[in-house]
Amino acid sequence: MANCSQEELDEEFEQFMKELSDDSFENSDKTARQSKKEMKKKDTVPWWITEDDFKDDGLLGTNVSYLKTKKTSQPVMEIEEESAEKIQFLKSSGTSLLSTDSLETNELVVSELNHSSLGVGLDTLEEQEEKEQFFARLEKGLTSSIDYSRLNKELDSNDSTHFKALHSNQANAELTDDEHENESKHEELAENYSDDFEDEYVGAPLTTKDEEMPSKENSKSEKISVPKQEEEKTGMLANVVLLDSLDSVAEVNLDEQDKITPKPRCLPEMTENEMTGTGVSYGQSSSDVEALHQAYCHIAHSLGDEDKQKIESNTVEDIKSSVKGHPQENEENSKNISTMESDLPTVEELMKPIRIDSFGISGFDLQPVSSEKVAERKETEFFSSLPLKMNPNILSQDSQHVNLFFDKNDENVILQKTTNESMENSCPQVTEVTATEEHVDKMYLNILRKKITVNSSSLSQDDKINKTYRSQLSSEEEGAVMGKQVPYKKARSAPPLLKRKPQSGLYASVRSSGYGKPSSPLKMFSTLEKKTSEDIIKSKNLRSISTSNQPRKKEILSGTKLIKPAALDKPAHKTESCLSTRKKSENPTETDSCIQFQTDSLGYCGENKEKKLLMFKRVQEAEDKWRGAQALIEQIKATFSEKEKELENKLEELKKQQEKELFKLNQDNYILQAKLSSFEETNKKQRWLHFGEAADPVTGEKLKQIQKEIQEQETLLQGYQQENERLYNQVKDLQEQNKKNEERMFKENQSLFSEVASLKEQMHKSRFLSQVVEDSEPTRNQNFTDLLAELRMAQKEKDSLLEDIKRLKQDKQALEVDFEKMKKERDQAKDQIAYVTGEKLYEIKILEETHKQEISRLQKRLQWYAENQELLDKDALRLREANEEIEKLKLEIEKLKAESGNPSIRQKIRLKDKAADAKKIQDLERQVKEMEGILKRRYPNSLPALILAASAAGDTVDKNTVEFMEKRIKKLEADLEGKDEDAKKSLRTMEQQFQKMKIQYEQRLEQQEQLLACKLNQHDSPRIKALEKELDDIKEAHQITVRNLEAEIDVLKHQNAELDVKKNDKDDEDFQSIEFQVEQAHAKAKLVRLNEELAAKKREIQDLSKTVERLQKDRRMMLSNQNSKGREEMSAKRAKKDVLHSSKGNANSFPGTLDSKLYQPHTFTDSHVSEVLQENYRLKNELEGLISEKNELKMKSEAVMNQFENSMRRVKEDTAAHIASLKASHQREIEKLLCQNAVENSSSKVAELNRKIATQEVLIRHFQSQVNELQSKQESLVVSEVREEILQKEITKLLEELREAKENHTPEMKHFVGLEKKIKQMEMRHAQREQELQQIIQQTHQVVETEQNKEVEKWKRLAQLKNRELEKFRTELDSILDVLRELHRQGVVVPVAFADEMNAPEY
């Protein structure tokens, strides 16, 4: 066994684990083989890692769930290659887990643990027994005496289990109550969960493999709605359900399939068991079960498998989403069971066809008593013809039935229909409840008025209504008895029912898509339960069902139960709204006509007024009572909802606290489990490794320690189990409190519904009384009143049409006026656009020109910058090279310093090198001489000998000179290039400075102009305005005086004309005296003088206007403002025109006075002399008065002229002073500008000098740095010289000591000393030769330098000559360019030479 492989060990370990879980032992062979593949993929993962890390693991565990996932988890994707193996593995290993009953949860937990990966907590048999006892106690505790079935019945308004059962396949219809007896049957369906392992999944069959992928896709869409509190991982205990319901697990998958494939399809006949799901209710509400599930989801962390946590969390997530999405399905089971032993139908079975949640078309159920079986058939047709996706046939059928009901005058049906419609619209949206109730109230009132006004055609209908009313009362009593009998019975498991009859009708097989959002019972409780009692009364009113007809009634109910609340989806809303609008559109017309008829009949018949008034009062009182009751109901509902919310909040808080505590406990559990698993792994490894060997005492001790630790862990686990039990008891207590509260609220709600029902009965009674009173009225005046109503309507229509015509005419006129305005505005806009476009074009042209100029200028600047950049690049290169050379020289200096550090070594090296060189030179010279001797001996007159002789003579000198000259030329070329570049740089700097100066100058000019403009505006504007005002005042005064004088002259002319007529008459009759003639002459003279004065004044005014114009021109010139210039010119022109007009008027206003009238001799022929004398005297008096007036006027005009002259003089003086001050300021500004210009122009020279100074300073700094370097070198040289002297002294001392030592030694030493002396002599000779050579070299250097200096001077002269020539050439070019500019300015065209003429060769 020690040599066993790991796989065999794993197999044996798996068998051991299977033996612990009783059920899975049978299939251990299969799991042993297939777990090899699976276990390799699985690794233990700690609890804090999210499920996203398991994406690539495929199906991770045995108990695979295909339900909705959590927010954090990704949907588990199937791999096709491994799917068959994994399904087989599921069948082999997971059957026992999924097929066991909920009473065997201890085995479930153990198998869950045993299926974990290697080393995740092993449970002992003692633990298993404790768990069995614990869960048995829990299940016993669940069967409490509290009956929750009644609450589930009454609160649930959405009966969706039947509908979902219809969607299931026929293969799954074999699940009945005996499915818990045989485990083999469950093993056949091992892919799916058993009914007992889910809590809130109800009424759907098990899912197959085909449904796996759609469910996974839909699980993605449901991730968002999952709250964050559910993100903790859940174990296998999430699947443990304590016999709450035997509903199927795969409910959610059906919903998801419905969502994916919402198209209706034909369904087979179903048994009663299929219709009702599993059909068993254990009295738990959805909220209690949800709380229990949350508690067990968190407890299961301690027992969960780490590799299967993902799948298990998916299942729990689906539980919770199903609780939210389908909270009514659990409660539907309890309703379906109700009372199977008794033959009597329950309240729920009677209420089902009338409920609002059965598509809200319950009103169609209410047929008249006369129609029996036909009505039943039609009823089933109505119910079957209203699925989600309505056909046009269905709508037409519905509308036909609606018309049929209206034709029969069945008001109750209409009333029920409208109420159902309004409440059906309120079902999907709870917020519209109050609005729908108000709508129902209005419809009630309309129908009551209609009842009061409309005359019933026959008394037979009234008799029928009375009969139905009596039968209603009797059936109400029956229903009350039944309601008392039924709700308090405990729910029991129903036996399998007989097969029901299939639905009759055209659309019986059409199903709903089922993806609607069903409304929760908490929200819809108040609105739906309110209508139930009302609907019971009405259905019993019209049907009057007796106990003998109960079998038939059950058949009808079996047909109507198939209608689901999933119809509250959007398509259904559309169809219902269509129906309701049609019905509403029909009702108001009837009520309006009835009201009209009522008013006419009241006006015509005075007999029934008192009765009608009494009926009205009664109806109003009933309405008031009803409204008061409704207000009370609303208040009670509000309080009820508030209490509900408070309770919910408390429950949520408690749940949160419990979840936190459970989470902590789970964490602790997990840590302890991890420790246990590690201990167990080590224990197992040691056991298998040391198997077969002698047991050491050490291993025994270790085993004891491990057992102790295991016992401690077991005690801890027992403590945790006790804590879990305590928490579970708390949860149970809270649920019981919640149930009690719900029962209390339910009772209150029932009492309120009973009050509403009593109020409605009173309403019905009052309505029937009013109908009885109306039936007795005569019907003879109906046609007459109809005709009167038609007449009045026609007159009203005629008046309204006339008013419309008038209004339309007025509108037409207003529109015409607007149209004209728009036309004018359009023309103005066109003119304005034309004007603006012209101006804009001109502005655009100007802008284009300025832009072109700017572009050219910028291009020049760019070119200049590019050239400048090239120069800078060259300088940078040169700098780099210089830096490199400096670095090289520094390195050489360092080397030399290092070498010069020890001069004695250097001297020795030098001496050795010199000796070796001398020997080599001697050898080479000797060889050369020998070779030359051989050549001479062999070929005395040959070319090589001659060449040697010539080369020995003068080749060396020529070569040296040529090389020297070449070097010199290169050096000079380099200098010239450097000078050229320097010249370019200087030019660039000059250009830069010039541009800078130019920009500064321009900026300065702009600033000065701005300052000038500001100053002129500040100083001149008030003065000029004052002058302009004075001028305007003077002009106005002058014009007034001129007008007055013209008026006076006209008067005088008129008088003169009269006097001339009289004078002519008197001359004819010789009554004219000498005095009169004298006076006339005086008057003429005065008139002439006045005319002359007027002309002089006009001249003066013209002069003044000219001076004003001149002043204005001067001001315009000074301000240089174009806008003001135009304005002043216009004013000047106007002044001139005024003067001209006035002069013309004066010239024309004085025609010839004497020559204007002709002589008429017969005017005074018949007049008497005395009359003539009287007339003459009167005229004399008048003339004197006129003369005096004229004198006064003359005095006035003179005074006015004096004033005018004074004012003009003052104006002239002021303007002269102002002009003088302006000229002075202008002069000052010009001087300032000149000074600035001179300073700026002179500053260019200053800048040059400054530049030279800067260059000199740079040179001085450079020389100073060189001097400093030399000084430092000098100091180092002094130090080195001192060091050399000391060393020399030491050497001399040592040499003397050596000599003394040598003298004291053998003759060999003497010989050595002699050789040394010879060497010294030879060195001395060598030094002398070197000195001579140095002298020769210095002499040659001096000669070369002199020649170089001469060459440099010569090249300098040449360069200066070239520069002068260039300057001359530039000046000539400038002059030529100036001439060309002048010619171009004058318009002379200069002929340009062609390229071939320019390039023609010269001979």
Curated annotation (Swiss-Prot):
Subcellular location(s) of the protein: Cytoplasm, Cytoskeleton, Microtubule organizing center, Centrosome, Centriole; Cytoplasm, Cytoskeleton, Spindle; Nucleus
Annotated InterPro entries: CEP162-like
Domain of life (superkingdom): Eukaryota
Location of the region described as Disordered in the Swiss-Prot/TrEMBL record: 18-42, 170-231, 476-504
Keyword Nucleus: yes
Keyword annotations from UniProtKB, A to Z: Cilium biogenesis/degradation, Coiled coil, Cytoplasm, Cytoskeleton, Microtubule, Nucleus, Phosphoprotein
Coiled-coil regions listed in the entry: 617-670, 698-1121, 1171-1206, 1235-1386
Ranges of Basic residues composition bias in the record: 487-502
Ranges annotated as biased composition (Basic and acidic residues): 208-231
GO biological process, one term: cilium assembly
Major subcellular location class: cytoplasm
Annotated Gene Ontology cellular component terms: axonemal microtubule; centriolar satellite; centriole; centrosome; ciliary basal body; cytosol; Golgi apparatus; intracellular membrane-bounded organelle
Subunit structure: Interacts with CEP290. Interacts with CPNE4. Interacts with alpha-tubulin.
Entries under PANTHER family matching the protein: CENTROSOMAL PROTEIN OF 162 KDA (PTHR34031:SF1)
Function, as annotated: Required to promote assembly of the transition zone in primary cilia. Acts by specifically recognizing and binding the axonemal microtubule. Localizes to the distal ends of centrioles before ciliogenesis and directly binds to axonemal microtubule, thereby promoting and restricting transition zone formation specifically at the cilia base. Required to mediate CEP290 association with microtubules.
Family: Belongs to the CEP162 family.
Note: Promotes ectopic assembly of transition zone components at cilia tips when targeted outside distal ends of centrioles, generating extra-long cilia with strikingly swollen tips.
Stated name of the protein: Centrosomal protein of 162 kDa
Species of provenance: Homo sapiens (Human)
